[in-house]
């Protein structure tokens, strides 16, 4: 019933409600950020940054309803004209991960709703409070009941979404195994499926680079949000003779990286999301040692006074990692950076292209030709 009403609402009226939603989010911005910190654990500045990224999509969605125009072609055949119109799909669904409980949902539902669809959001069971609050704020902005719905649960709820014939489209962000599961079962039930899986993202560090810039970039890319993001650069590829100095500079930075509770203004990295995830990340560090990688910085046993039972781990740094090791092949999803050494640029490109997956990559160099060649040869994204 909600779809029947919302799908025929004039575009300008939809746009006004979404614009009001944007204003309501801005009014409650700090409250939402604190919800993320309290439930997920990321530091306050990271929480605010992720909210801002999501809000940008809401702002963009405000203009979408009036851009949905059809086409007309005259006389495509004898006395035949052709019209095409753009119609909503219906009830769409989104399944989102724990690491960005506001930003990733806001990539999905504002755009779908702007186009006249209704939406079911299944957030992570680890931190659902912010999505639930967003639903309340959307209603406060004037969205009719039933247009945006949040359902909590685990695999049982996911399967119900995938099997429901009244849901024609599903979006997913999360791990690669579950992305494959979503694709397989969604396609089996004739749904449109959009799924973003996990990754192992590389950063190539060339001998001619500005090393300070590379190290500062890697500190944010590898350890920001405690490494709990699909775009985290968890592999640094050291080309030529740059490896020793790169490892030395990163290890020095890690010595002063402040780990602590998210609302502490001095904290640069917060805890991991759950005890189970902490044990998983620690297990990967244990595995790296067994596999023969050199653990240069070990953050496994970090202790914070007053937070002894918190899910904290310090930044970890491995050197002499090889492509046959599991810590290189698999997504750790924690503050762990692996340094792989290669002899030249071509070997670096081959290493990245041979990896099973990757959402993004980068190169630090002063040579414009190297940057251009890198962009054209890399098969990532």
List where the protein language model places each region.
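N-terminal alpha-helical segment of soluble enzymes
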Residues: 1-44, 241
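Residues at or immediately preceding the N-termini of alpha-helices
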Residues: 11, 29, 44, 211, ...
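Long amphipathic alpha-helix in the N-terminal Rossmann-like dinucleotide-binding domain
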Residues: 19-30, 42-68
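A structural signal for short, well-ordered beta-strand elements
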Residues: 7-8, 40, 150, 207, ...
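ALDH superfamily catalytic-core signature
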Residues: 177-322, 344, 351, 378
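Rossmann-like NAD(P) dinucleotide-binding subdomain of oxidoreductase/dehydrogenase enzymes
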Residues: 70-213, 342, 365
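Conserved C-terminal structural/oligomerization subdomain of aldehyde/semialdehyde dehydrogenase
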Residues: 167, 204, 258, 308-381
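Residue-level signal for inorganic ion chemistry
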Residues: 14, 36, 58, 116, ...
């Amino acid at each position: 019933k909600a779809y029947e009403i919302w799908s025929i609402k004039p575009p300008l009226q939809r746009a006004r409600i979404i614009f009001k939603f944007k204003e309501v989010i801005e009014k409650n911005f700090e409250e939402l950020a604190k919800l993320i910190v309290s439930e997920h654990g990321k530091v306050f500045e990271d929480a605010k940054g992720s909210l801002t990224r999501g809000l940008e999509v809401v702002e963009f969605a405000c203009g979408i309803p009036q851009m949905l125009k059809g086409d007309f072609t005259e006389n495509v055949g004898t006395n035949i004209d052709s019209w095409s119109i753009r119609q909503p799909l219906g009830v769409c669904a989104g399944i989102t991960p724990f690491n960005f409980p506001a930003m990733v949902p806001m990539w999905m539902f504002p755009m779908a709703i702007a186009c006249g669809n209704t939406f079911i959001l299944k957030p992570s069971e680890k931190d659902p409070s912010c999505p639930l609050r967003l639903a309340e704020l959307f209603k406060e902005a004037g969205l009719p009941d039933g247009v945006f719905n949040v359902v909590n649960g685990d695999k049982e709820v996911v399967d119900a979404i995938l099997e429901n014939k009244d849901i024609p489209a599903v979006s997913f962000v999360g791990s690669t195994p579950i992305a494959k599961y979503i694709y397989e079962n969604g396609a089996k039930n004739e749904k449109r499926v959009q799924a973003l899986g996990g990754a192992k993202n590389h950063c190539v560090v060339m001998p001619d680079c500005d090393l300070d810039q590379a190290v500062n970039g890697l500190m944010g890319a590898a350890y920001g949000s405690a490494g709990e993001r699909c775009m985290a650069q968890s592999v640094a590829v050291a080309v030529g003779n740059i490896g020793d100095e790169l490892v030395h500079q990163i290890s020095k930075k890690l010595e002063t990286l402040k780990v602590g509770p998210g609302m502490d203004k001095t904290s640069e990295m917060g805890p991991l999301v759950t005890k189970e995830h902490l044990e998983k990340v620690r297990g990967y560090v244990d595995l790296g040692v067994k596999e023969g990688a050199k653990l240069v910085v070990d953050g496994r046993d970090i202790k914070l006074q007053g937070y002894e039972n918190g899910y904290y781990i310090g930044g970890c740094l491995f050197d002499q990692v090889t492509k046959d090791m599991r810590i290189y092949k698999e997504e750790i999803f924690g503050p762990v950076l692996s340094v792989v050494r290669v002899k030249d640029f071509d070997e670096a490109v081959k290493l990245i292209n041979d990896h099973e997956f990757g959402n993004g990559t980068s190169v630090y160099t002063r040579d414009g030709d190297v940057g251009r060649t890198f962009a054209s040869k890399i098969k990532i994204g």
